[in-house]
Structure formats: C-alpha cells, structure tokens
C-alpha cells in the first residue's frame, strides 16, 4: 500500500525526476512511496516527502476528496466521495482494480527548501503553468531549464531526455484546474 503528497513550496510543486524503466525518457513522479508498519496514509506521505525531498510538511485540508480507478489514471473518471478514516483527508484516492488497496494523495505545504535525497536523482520544482506546458507538448529537460524551469539535480541526467509526465502530474493539473484556491 502506498501514499503520496502534493507539496506546495513557494507556489511550486516538487516532483521527482529520473529515467523511466525503459530508459527512454525522464519520468516525472510524485513524492510518496510504500507504507511502513502501522503508518497511516498521511504519516507515510509526510515521511516520504522528508526522505525524498528533505521537506517537513504540514497538511492542507482539501476542498473535497476525489476517487478514481488507478488502471485509468491517464484519463480517469474522478468522482467525489467521503474519506471515512480518521485524520487527514486526501485530495485524491486511487483504487486498484480487483484489489482492496488504495493510494491516498494528500495536499501539503512546506517552508523548507527542497533537497533531493540520496535515493532521488533530482527534483523539478513545477509551477502550475509549467505543469500545463509539460502536459501539452513534448519537452526535454534542457528545454524546460532553458525556459526558466527550476530543478535540483543530484544525478547527471541527459538534457536531451524527454520529460514523461506520470499519471499523478496529470491528476494534479486536473485538481488545480478544478480548485485554483489550492494555490493560495
């Protein structure tokens, strides 16, 4: 079972960047990972934000919670639904088809400066406009940086590497379109 978090840091959202499994592009992946022990979803997301980007995070209550099927994450049908667990409510909950597993994704803020950890190749610090650009056309890491994009890179990533948005970046874009108040 996994959990993730969209962290707002000075109007930007840190996402991990690194080679995809096939080595054909640079995947853009949300902060998050597998739960450990008896962690809640929020505890996992907060720990992963710290482990991957050195961010101490504070939860932001979402305007609502959306559910979707993870198998359709590129073009999911999202619907509002209640979060019945105690504690912090997520903005998104991905349900895995034919399994009881869920992946909650939370909203958070941080005053810290993101720093990629030893397990993170790099971080892109994405503005809402940059997210829209990455989703609307093919762009390389070099083009992103030349256009003023912000990145913190630990590894030597190829500047000609095509940026590949993973589903959670598309989902964040949709959420920001529906709820621009999240940015304030």
Language model region names:
Residues 1-31, 42, 56-61:
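N-terminal strand-loop-strand
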Residues 3, 33, 37, 94:
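Conserved aromatic-histidine-acidic binding/catalytic patches
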Residues 11-13, 22-24, 36-37, 65-68, ...:
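Short, charged/polar surface micro-motifs in flexible loops or helix N-caps
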Residues 15, 54-55, 115-118:
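Short acidic, gly/pro-rich beta-turn/loop elements at beta-sheet edges
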Residues 23-27, 87-184:
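Nudix hydrolase/Nudix homology domain
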Residues 30-81:
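The catalytic Nudix box helix
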Residues 84:
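Conserved short secondary-structure elements within globular domains
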């Amino acid at each position: 079972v996994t959990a993730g978090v969209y962290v707002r840091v000075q109007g930007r959202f840190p996402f991990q960047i690194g080679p995809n499994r096939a080595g054909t592009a640079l995947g853009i992946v949300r902060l998050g990972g597998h739960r450990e022990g008896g962690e809640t979803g929020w505890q996992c997301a907060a720990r992963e934000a710290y482990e991957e980007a050195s961010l101490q995070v504070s939860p932001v209550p979402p305007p609502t919670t959306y559910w979707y099927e993870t198998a359709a994450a590129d073009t999911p049908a999202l619907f509002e639904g209640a979060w019945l667990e105690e504690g912090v409510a997520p903005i998104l909950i991905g349900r895995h088809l034919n399994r009881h597993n869920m992946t909650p994704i939370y909203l958070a803020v941080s005053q810290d400066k993101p720093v990629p950890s030893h397990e993170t190749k790099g971080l892109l610090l994405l503005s809402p406009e940059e997210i829209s650009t990455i989703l609307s056309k093919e762009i390389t890491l070099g083009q992103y940086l030349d256009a003023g994009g912000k990145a913190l890179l630990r590894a030597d990533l190829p500047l000609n590497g095509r940026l590949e948005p993973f589903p959670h970046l598309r989902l964040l874009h949709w959420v920001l379109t529906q709820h621009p108040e999240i940015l304030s």
